[in-house]
Amino acid sequence: MIVERPVTILGEPSLEAALALPPGAPLGVVLCHPHPRYGGDLDSPVVVAAAEACARQGLATLRFNFRGVGASAGAWDEGRGERDDVRAALADLRRQLAPPARVALAGYSFGASLAAAVAAGGERLAGLALIGPPLATPGWQRPGPLAIDGPLLVVAGSEDPYCPRAALAALATVMPEAIVTVIDGADHFFSAGLEALDAALADWAAKVW
């Protein structure tokens, strides 16, 4: 069972978060939740499951609420300011880790879109996991070159209408280094595939260095 404590990421705006920080941990992962306009927050089941999978591999974990969600200050910014929220969370976790203080990034659904955008924006990462990326939605933008020094995972359910196999295959052609995992029978919410998702994320987290 992951042991977390509530924290606040200071900044403009301040962000509500949950941190699990093993003593002396040099590696960590920031987790981005799904779309806040559709009820997504840091307690979304997939985000919690992802944090638990990473924590079992010894990584510090930081789940946070985007601006305007829960106790986070600010207001919805159409995905623009939310990218700054991701960067603030990455910087906050880095400050709390032991050297070399390397941080990976994982995002689910809308959170995967922002994680990919931040990785393509030059943020140096120890790994990237895109969970159920919404490839078939207008909000998805194919990322450019990614600044990643570790494993890249793309995982989706076979029954996910927002991440069809054709779009997933197209993404794999521009991310040849990615481990692409399709979970049979799982939908966008992984309601029938949380165990398989847990295994895929634990394997990814074990490769973060």
Where are these regions (language model features)?
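Serine-hydrolase catalytic machinery in alpha/beta-hydrolase-like enzymes
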Residues: 9, 14-98
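Catalytic histidine-centered segment of alpha/beta-hydrolase-like enzymes
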Residues: 74, 186-198
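Short beta-strand immediately N-terminal to the catalytic nucleophile in serine-hydrolase-like folds
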Residues: 104-107, 131
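Gly/Ala-rich beta-loop-alpha elbow adjacent to hydrolase catalytic centers
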Residues: 107-115
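A conserved short beta-strand
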Residues: 124-136
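Acidic catalytic loop of the alpha/beta-hydrolase fold
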Residues: 136-137, 158-163, 188-189
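Short beta-strand/loop motif that positions the catalytic acidic residue
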Residues: 147-149, 153-156, 160
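Catalytic histidine neighborhood in serine/cysteine hydrolases
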Residues: 173-189
